[in-house]
Amino acid sequence: MANILKSGKLPAPARIIEEAIVGPSLGKESISAGMFSFIFALIVVLIYVALYYSGAGLAANIALLVNIFFIFGVLASIGAVLTLPGIAGIILTIGMSIDANVLIYERIREEMKNGKGLKLAVTDGYNSAYSSIIDANVTTLLTAIILYTFGTGPIKGFATTLVIGILTSLFAAIFITRLIISARLDKGKTISFATKMTQRAFQNINIDFIGKRKRYYILSSVVIILGIGSLITKGLNFGVDFVGGRTYVVRFDDAVDNEAVRSALSAVFVDENGKSSTAQVKTFGPDNQVKITTSFMIQSKDITTDKVVESKLAEGLATTGLEYEIMSSQKVGATIADDIKDAALWSVIFSLIVIFLYILVRFRKWQFSLGAIVSLAHDVLIVLSVFSIFYGILPFSLEIDQAFIAAILTIIGYSINDTVVVFDRMREYLNNNKKKGLHATANDALNSTLSRTFNTSLTTFVVLLIIFISGGEVIKGFMFALMVGVVVGTYSSLFIASTITLDTTKKED
């Protein structure tokens, strides 16, 4: 296209400043790995939900299958291209879509525990859960929309499936599951919301989360200080999205020595002025596959530069004496890298501002907003710290790229989802018993939502773990960030958000 435009009458020639190419072999492998992960994760979630919630779990499973059908139907109707990040978005939706049903079922179980009949418990359970479901999903939806607005390419695909998944999940949980349960009850039949193994799970739990908050402050502070130290001394492994350059994933027909490849490429990556550019070579998956990163001639504006670089790359790789195939390549110009970096920073900042304002409007107290934002900043810092500390240690890529920013925004959405559920219960308890202190109310809210927190976090983490293991090398770093985020987000919703809210409230209401 650049050549076509150059041959026309434009006053300035066009050149490609950002490009991503995926070879047919890698594309086929990625989609196969993604679909396998999708089916495996779906089966695991279906079994777990049925084992935990019995008959009601089967109703939730039917709704989940309908939800997936809706997602694929909407994607097909808008002509969306199914990419690996898009598949990851669908798989993540599987884990998160269970959350609405878990919220509803736990409220129904509470109503039944308080002595209500099954029909009344179902009605009141749904009515009580609506507020938490809407608030939790709106905050996640807002971050997904921001991700779509600031993201490019595959990241938009991930955000698109996430937005569609959130909306269809709400419909499936609120309408389809209730339709199935109500139809059964109207026929005079009963339905169980627990099995013998799970009917007493998380009952009579009374953990003093608030009383031990100083321990959690110290623990989080130590981890963050270590992380900041690593960020200062070691830094982060920025990908070409943020610094500009070229990357190639190359597969050889036999194991290859990374240092030999690096030396060979450094010897040929010399421009017309005699300036040499180094190449970074790392094993990418199996020992016969490497990822090559270089800034060689990335500043050049000559339209023939790409062909020159490809020729030099072929010359260097030929010295290995092995047959090879370029599985994928990516090029990001320095100007585009700066734009991506700015967009990434603003997307995170804008997400935090929007969430602060939404929590302020919904809960009418700035202390709730502050508690939420501090916990989110805590989550982001710890994920960054983990990527800095373990960069070069773990046997897979921990690059900071657009996918990582997508992971950070997803973590923000997931974590605030968790936090809002607790805040909503705190608000409910404060309205029902205004004489009870905030300390006791916060503990009651955390303990009463512990079952929901456990089930949602476990299903989401298991889904992510399955993708991490079987989804292929391309998506490992992205999934690792999400896995760390789920663990840290769950921790902060239990031990940071509510305690910050409590400590910044001058008096108990």
Where are these regions (language model features)?
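A structural signal for conserved, well-ordered secondary-structure elements
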Residues: 1-509
